[in-house]
């Protein structure tokens, strides 16, 4: 069983640290090396590898500094994105072994064209593809690509823990509560999130089961969501419902 802890970075990023019982660890999307090195020193951990989901600087900015401290680091990342320092390129369907656990690589284009996610041990590290109550902006991909990527993630077991890369839950809730005003699960989740954030507690990880109840981008087949975007969508297909929802959120 692997343990996961968050390392906050910048304003709202989470760098995820995965470690085993023998004080060896992996970090996911280290945009900044400084907080990572601090945790490694404080907890006497040895860094073995880095997992990268996509090429944006707030996810890769710490690679070079971490490699200076750990020259033999294996840096795993998407094959189709220009990321300096990658030593193991991966794509959809590949596997990465971490401390005896096999993690599957999932291609999830949308936020960026080469974006990947890693799933194993009941945990999904999905970068900026799926957030709690939200999804990533389409900087490079199309609505159809992101829609299919989210469907791929939604097909994972409901108990899968969702480790996204940003603390966006409160702002995402503000939009979701407009998009689906009568969803009782959203009302309850808002109360939970407000309490957690007031206490300085992270809302991540979420679970896939929870997201299917509250995340409008995973609920595009629901009549309540279709009704909300009816004046913004070109038709009532699930894909166009998603596209209209994403356009709405971009300008919310």
Curated annotation (Swiss-Prot):
Function: Thiolesterase that catalyzes the hydrolysis of S-D-lactoyl-glutathione to form glutathione and D-lactic acid.
HAMAP family xref list: Glyoxalase_2
Taxonomic lineage: Bacteria, Pseudomonadati, Pseudomonadota, Gammaproteobacteria, Vibrionales
The protein's name in its UniProt record: Hydroxyacylglutathione hydrolase
Cofactor binding annotation: Binds 2 Zn(2+) ions per subunit.
Enzyme Commission number(s) of this protein: 3.1.2.6
Residues binding Zn(2+) 2: 58-59, 128, 166
Keywords in alphabetical order: Hydrolase, Metal-binding, Zinc
